[in-house]
Amino acid sequence: MLKEKRNKGFVSGLVFALFFLVFAGLVFSLWMRHQNHATSFAKAEKSGDPVTMLIYDITPEPVGTVGKRHVLYIVQYDNQNDGKYAGIEAKKDDATIKAIVDKAQKGELQSDPYQLKGTQLAPLAKDSKNTSRNGRIVGYSEYIHSLLDPTSIVSLNMTTSYYLSLTEYNKDSLFLLLGSVALAGLAITMVVASFSVRKRTIASYQELHQNYPELQGDLSRLADEASYYNQDLKVILYKNHLITYFRGTQTIDLRDVQQLYLHVTRVRQSGIARSIFQLCYTRKDKPKKKYRLAIKNKKNAEEQLYTLFAQVSERFPDVKVGI
């Protein structure tokens, strides 16, 4: 039995929107934690973790290149005794690195170390496979030691089991931020779409009641007296109106329609091909604009709609029908 359901498709849309909004909040909280971590480079133990490094000195120029767009610097991150040293990977002409180099050249870092945020990464040995989400330098330890005098203070106190990556840190930050924004945007879009579906559904019921007073309070007559009624596809042809009630209710007066056809979109997901069916139409007063009616997807939708198209062609000869 058909009933008037003004909130059909509305509540479920809001529930999904709430889910995406909560997910967006979780991703944003991860971004906040990523930006405000307190673990220092000297104490961090896990590759891929965001850390903070205090920089007391830095080489004025890069000591090496990583690929075509990235470079390596050596920095002092501890000033106790002979100090401790490590490598930093960053993009060429990185603004943060330039600021640190400027402070070092002015002699300001020893008394006022620069607090740098980055991702601590363990380098890869040669011929080993990277299984982490982050890009990592191969043969880092051997390369760094090849640059240094093995008896120098820097070489003797150089940390080569880890290095700091600004590139991966910025990439992770951007991913989390854009992810939270995208999810929040999707949630807002779903809320707007849900209210649009409800508004369209209410307008459809009002149009039916206005044109067919006998339906007020008793929509079951749609199914009983319809010339075409398909519960699988959620499609009804009642007198002059074509009605779909999948994901909300939509109605069109076929006397205003110029063309009615089935639009089939073929998609492939995970190697499985499937078809998405939609009824489309154009109006006589707006022949260039295409409107869509949502129907339930069924493999044999084309065959099931032949009867509908035949009835429309017979009763509304001005309407062009097809698939």
Task: Give a label for each model feature.
Residues 261-323:
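Acidic, Ser/Thr- and proline-rich intrinsically disordered linker/docking segments
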Residues 54-58, 242, 251-267:
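Phosphoinositide-dependent membrane-docking surfaces
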